[in-house]
Structures are given as C-alpha cells and as structure tokens.
A protein has these predicted regions:
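Subset-of-secretome marker
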Residues: 1-197
C-alpha cells in the first residue's frame, strides 16, 4: 500500500510539472592498487575538476518537462517500483503530510543488465549507471585502458519523501543510491587488473 501510494505521488511530479530543484552529489572510492587503480583515481580527479561529480543544481520551472531532471531520467514516469524490490517501507503522518521511507533490497546489476536499466529493479525508480554512459566515458581513455567488465551491486538504496496528505503531491524527495562496482580492465603496459570502486 505504501509503495503504491509512493508510485502515484512520484508519477504526479512528471504529470503536473510543479517545478523542481535537483541537487546531486556523486562520489566514488577506489579500492585496489597498481596502475589500473591509479588510472581510476586520475579519472576521478578529472571528473571532480570538470564538475561531473558535483554538478551544479538543476532548476526546472513549473510547467516545463521534468523528464530529464527527476528520476527515472528521460522517462515520462517516475516510478514503477514493486513491493518485491523493497526490504522495508514506513509511513508517518505529521502536519498534514506523509513522510515515507523506502529501503530497497540489494541488487546486483551486470554490465549486460546495465544496457537495459529499465529491466532492473533499481532502474524502475532511480537512475543507475548505464552501460552506454560507461562506454562513452571510456572512449577518451581507450588508448590507455580497455574495459572488459563492470559489475555493480546496489546496497543501501533509500528514498525519503514528503507527500501532501490532501493533494497527494510530493513536496520533497531525497534519493540515496550506493553502488559498489567491480571493474575488470586491462592496460597495454600492465596487463589485466581488477579494481573495486
């Protein structure tokens, strides 16, 4: 019942287009050593410098399309979350609003599954790292490193939102998404290596 209520409220954001401000904070931590881990750390430093890891807030005006700014990115809907993907859900009423907290079950997403993110449980409600995004980022490093595989495990994903009890309009939403990735790559100089990020 809580999940169904959340889905309706989340989907109303893209239908009613109330205006939204998206603030994103992205970080990753590289575990491992050697040349490949060193390259991964250099990529992270470059992403920090060009603003990819801490992009400027995005403000979408009332009435404008929210499809690109609000999860799920570039879809006309926001959530198709199923109860089977959830480990717990709670709802507390306070001051005319419902505060909903959803904790998702852990999910392993292979590099091949990341090619079809909407077929994953996380991809039904949050933006996950997609294979085409990884491929695009790796193009600039193709002279240095070849990516063979990238497995992601999403663990601890939490959604906390406040929904107006009368209008069922979402007032705020906070998505916390944690992905642990294992990257298998090779570099001409050092050979094969595995890095956890």
């Amino acid at each position: 019942e809580i999940i169904a209520y959340f889905n309706v409220a989340a989907n109303k954001v893209k239908i009613e287009k109330p205006g939204v401000k998206k603030i994103e904070e992205i970080s990753f931590h590289v575990k491992g050593d050697g040349a490949i881990a060193n390259i991964a750390n250099k990529v992270q430093d470059a992403l920090k410098k060009n603003g990819t890891l801490n992009p400027d807030p995005i403000t979408v005006k009332k009435g404008a399309s929210h499809n690109a700014a609000f999860p799920v990115e570039n879809q006309s809907w926001s959530s198709r979350l199923s109860a089977g993907a959830v480990s717990s859900a709670s709802c507390v009423e306070k001051n005319g609003a419902y505060m909903i907290t959803i904790r998702m079950k852990d999910e392993h997403i292979s590099y091949e599954q990341a090619r079809k993110p909407l077929q994953t449980k996380h991809g039904q409600v949050v933006d996950i790292l997609k294979a085409n995004e990884i491929d695009e980022q790796m193009k600039s490093l193709s002279w240095l490193v070849t990516l063979h595989d990238l497995d992601q495990t999403y663990s601890g994903t939490t959604i906390v939102c406040t929904i107006d009890a009368k209008s069922q309009t979402m007032r705020s939403a906070h998505y916390r998404i944690i992905s642990n990735a294992t990257i298998k790559a090779s570099a001409p100089i050092v050979g094969d290596a595995t890095v956890n990020a």
